[in-house]
Amino acid sequence: QLMRRSADGLMDGSLPAEKLAEIEAVLAKYRQQGIAFHALRTRQAGSRSFVMVHVLVPGDWSVRQAHDWAERIEAELREVLGHAHVTTHLEPVEDPLSMIDQELDRPAP
């Protein structure tokens, strides 16, 4: 038991279920604004939390508008999680390639 707890402190793992629920609650508020999310990935490394998520916005939004929404989402996630490192990736919701999130290399269009 002691060795497992010691090793857990050295190994990265995903965030605990209660933190994932907090993330989902934040994202649910933004879904009501027409924003979609996928490819949510979390990691706990020591005392530091990391969150990565793809943010799908209408393709006719300006870069500024999409960026402003992404900044709001990142700030709220950091507030809820206590200074986590949050990374978002903006994608147009209409683009079928936006739905491919499992592969590191995307096929050429």
Placement of each model-derived feature along the sequence:
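Alpha-helical transmembrane segments and adjacent TM-loop junctions that form the membrane-embedded core
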Residues: 1-109
